[in-house]
Amino acid sequence: MAEKHQDKMTNAMNNSKLYLIQSFGCQMNERDAESLAGMLEDLGYCPTSAQEEADIILLNTCCVRETAESKVFGLLGRLRKLKVAKPDLILGVCGCMSQQEDAAKRIRRSFPFVDLIFGTHNIHELPRMIHQVQENHEAVLEVWATEKGITESIPVKRKDKLKAWVTIMYGCNNFCTYCIVPYVRGRERSRQPEDIIDEIKELVQEGYKEVTLLGQNVNSYGKDFKNNYRFADLLMAIDDITGLERVRFMTSHPRDFDQRLIEVVASAKKVCEHYHLPAQAGSNRVLKMMNRGYTREHYLELIRKIKERVPNASITADLMVGFPGETEEDFQETLDLVKQVRYDSAFTFVYNIRSGTPAAKLEQVSEEVKSERIQRLIELQNLISLENNQREEGRVLEVLVEGETKTNPDLLAGRTRTNKLVVFQGSGHLPGQLVQIRITKGRPNLLEGEVVPNGT
């Protein structure tokens, strides 16, 4: 049963105090950062982008890839001088990396000036832990070994005013052999549907147009319930919310994307025609070593079923290169999978060792081979992305306007229902509007277009 968040301590802080949160990693971490920001602002802190101005700095860490950990350790080293100059600065490390016992100990040993270390299971305790640091003038290391249910009603400070992340579940039960997530995020726990629906209704009242439902595997939503309420049921309920324009979700596990879910996403008016389905590899031998729980044939049949019901569906994926034991033949099967599916885009990455996972003990592929293969994969996917986007030329697509582009204030940017980025001229259109755009140019990573007068 969800417990209510009660640790506010608003009067303990001064409004002039500033905070900075730097996040690494996935969308779940971005959403966690919004909760951290919400609690800090409840305590009277205001955001800043300047480290030297901050009274509290939180590094919200990731441990999925070694590069993210290296960035955190490098940043901590650079923050040492700032901590010496500002001894009252509260410096904290949280998130997936600090949830690992070895990493937390390493932080404490190598960076003793860090004031606060906590993990993924107790971020709602942040106000109390800050108060403890200030009152006792000593560091707090508090990493819960296991999850203790779901805490609702945590304050949230969202970065976006149009689109919102909405977490529907936490944890993962899949234990892919390369992945550390189940060890740092815990077992799967689903939020109650009424809590999710209430949150989305509040977002709509605040002017939000689009929500993205988050979970390590959203298709597993509800499997921990005693009744038969599942992800498809939740989508149908959300689709009925008045005023909401668009619904997205991620991430889906190909093994659990069943026919009922396909029928629901095909018929729901607000669920966008974009499905992120991480394949990871195209070789059955590698998929088995990864413990993915499906075959290449199952994956391709799933894609066929989705496109049969949703012909204009956009399919994206995660693809890994260099898993231990991957041969050139295995890699060729991944390339062939990409050619068959013709992803609109793909997040491609090189496998790197995660201590504590089964794959770390296997014979590794050389860095030289991994580097060569990832370049071949990227080149192939970029070509397919370009060809797919060029096919959009001449079509009129609905675009949710997000605002000015970062590089040119005369251009606006927005996204289609299939999650393609579109840039166009149209300064009269305010963010949040749905406009009809005729696509004039397809590029590998975006579409260019022009506003269709009166939407015709």
UniProtKB/Swiss-Prot annotation:
One term of GO molecular function: metal ion binding
Originating species: Desulforamulus reducens (strain ATCC BAA-1160 / DSM 100696 / MI-1)
Chain ranges passing through the membrane: none
Identification of the protein by name: tRNA-2-methylthio-N(6)-dimethylallyladenosine synthase
Subunit: Monomer.
E.C. number(s) listed in UniProt: 2.8.4.3
Requisite cofactors: [4Fe-4S] cluster
Gene, per the UniProt record: miaB
Alphabetical list of NCBIfam families matching this protein: miaB-methiolase (TIGR01574), MiaB/RimO family radical SAM methylthiotransferase (TIGR00089)
Main location: cytoplasm
Start and end residues of each Radical SAM core domain: 158-387
Lineage, highest ranks first: Bacteria, Bacillati, Bacillota, Clostridia, Eubacteriales
Keywords: 4Fe-4S, Cytoplasm, Iron, Iron-sulfur, Metal-binding, S-adenosyl-L-methionine, Transferase, tRNA processing
Cofactor note: Binds 2 [4Fe-4S] clusters. One cluster is coordinated with 3 cysteines and an exchangeable S-adenosyl-L-methionine.
GO cellular component terms, semicolon-separated: cytosol
Family to which this protein belongs: Belongs to the methylthiotransferase family. MiaB subfamily.
Annotated InterPro entries: Elp3/MiaA/NifB-like_rSAM (IPR006638), Methylthiotransferase (IPR005839), Methylthiotransferase_CS (IPR020612), Methylthiotransferase_N (IPR013848), Methylthiotransferase_N_sf (IPR038135), MiaB_methiolase (IPR006463), rSAM (IPR007197), rSAM_horseshoe (IPR023404)
Residues given in the record as [4Fe-4S] cluster 2 binding sites: 172, 176, 179
Keyword Cytoplasm: yes
Domain TRAM: 390-453
Compartments in which it is found: Cytoplasm
Residues that, per the record, bind [4Fe-4S] cluster 1: 26, 62, 96
